[in-house]
């Protein structure tokens, strides 16, 4: 029972991994889940550099996982542009 509870909690926290860590991932492109595309609130990203505004932050283009992302050179583990999520 305890193991089941722990697994449920981990599965619930999985989409919010970027709240726990802000590590850069340099490797294969990751997919952006559809629910993140629907969370648009206010523009904090520069649309001229290919970032997509979402919940006071932005996620990186799948075509450019190592750059072209809100004037940064990489993305966090959950596709957030560093330094924009809580601006």
From Swiss-Prot:
Compartmental location: Secreted
Molecular function terms from GO: ion channel inhibitor activity; sodium channel regulator activity; toxin activity
Residues the record lists as 6'-bromotryptophan modifications: 59, 79-80, 86
Signal sequence, renumbered to the chain: 1-19
InterPro entries per record: Conotoxin
Propeptide boundaries: 20-42
Residues with the 4-carboxyglutamate modification: 63
Tissue expression from the record: Expressed by the venom duct.
Cellular compartments per GO CC: extracellular region
Domain text: The cysteine framework is XII (C-C-C-C-CC-C-C).
Stated family: Belongs to the conotoxin O1 superfamily.
Protein name: Mu-conotoxin cal12a
């Amino acid at each position: 029972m305890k193991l089941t509870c722990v697994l449920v909690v981990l599965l619930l926290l999985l989409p919010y991994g970027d709240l726990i860590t802000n590590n850069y991932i340099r490797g294969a492109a990751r997919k952006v889940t559809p629910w993140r595309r629907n969370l648009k609130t206010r523009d904090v990203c520069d649309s001229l550099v290919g970032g997509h505004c979402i919940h006071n932050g932005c996620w990186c283009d799948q075509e450019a996982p190592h750059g072209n992302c809100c004037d940064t050179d990489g993305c966090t583990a959950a596709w957030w542009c560093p330094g924009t999520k809580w601006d």
